[in-house]
């Protein structure tokens, strides 16, 4: 049996988890932190991990503001009615005004989007959903994360978050192990997501 090693990864940003949130956070971290060292660790493989791994047939919220289909105010009104008034309207508005740009980014990355043959707009299923061929959704977003990260570690099970000794109630690092080799990994980044 080979000797177990300890890998210490120094980085500016450590992203724990390679699902849609983690791969998206890795992409955004690079966008906003061009000169930072960014590392992402995932317990499986970022190409097919997380809830979106099996694929989707629709994106459940798209405003279509460029075609004047819906506006953020419309979505806030819908959410307020649907949730019987229990809604943070400011957060709903903020999400709604940014969601189209995320969808356009997925389109640029190559996510197959169904389109209305007459208008060329995205094909709708209901007021808010647009239809996609989403079998490749997660691998497409994972590819963006791979291009954005300095290093991706697959098969790393993070077992403990380390508390920052200098700031109370702040996570300062993470430790885990490679599920295939048994090697330990530790990281004390400037920021952990």
Enumerate the predicted regions with their spans.
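Anionic group-transfer/hydrolysis microenvironments
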Residues: 14, 44, 192
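Hydrophobic/aromatic ligand-binding patch that stacks against planar heteroaromatic rings
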Residues: 24, 28, 50-51, 192
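Conserved N-terminal/central alpha/beta ligand/cofactor-binding core
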Residues: 4-5, 36-37, 43-172, 177-183
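Core beta-strand elements of the Rossmann-like FAD/NAD(P) dinucleotide-binding domain
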Residues: 8-11, 180-191
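Mobile, glycine-rich extracellular loop/lid and propeptide segments
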Residues: 20, 175, 186-187
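N-terminal Rossmann-like FAD-binding beta1-loop-alpha1 element of flavoenzymes
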Residues: 13-40
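N-terminal/domain-start segments enriched in small and hydrophobic, helix-friendly residues
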Residues: 2-18
């Amino acid at each position: 049996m080979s000797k177990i090693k300890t890998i210490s990864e120094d980085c500016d940003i450590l992203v724990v988890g390679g699902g849609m949130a983690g791969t998206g956070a890795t992409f955004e971290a690079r966008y906003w932190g061009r000169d930072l060292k960014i590392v992402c660790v995932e317990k499986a493989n970022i190409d097919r991990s997380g809830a979106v791994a099996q694929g989707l047939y629709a994106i459940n919220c798209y405003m279509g503001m460029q075609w004047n289909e819906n506006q953020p105010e419309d979505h806030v009104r819908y959410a307020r009615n649907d949730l019987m008034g229990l809604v943070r309207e400011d957060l709903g508005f903020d999400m709604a005004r940014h969601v189209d740009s995320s969808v356009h980014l997925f389109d640029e990355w190559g996510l197959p989007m169904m389109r209305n043959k007459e208008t060329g707009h995205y094909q709708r299923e209901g007021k808010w959903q647009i239809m996609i061929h989403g079998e490749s959704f997660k691998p497409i977003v994972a590819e963006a994360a791979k291009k954005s990260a300095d290093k991706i570690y697959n098969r790393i099970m993070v077992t403990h978050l380390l508390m920052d000794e200098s700031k109370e109630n702040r996570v300062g690092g993470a430790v885990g192990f490679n599920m295939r080799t048994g090697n330990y990994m530790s990281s004390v980044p400037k920021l952990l997501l």
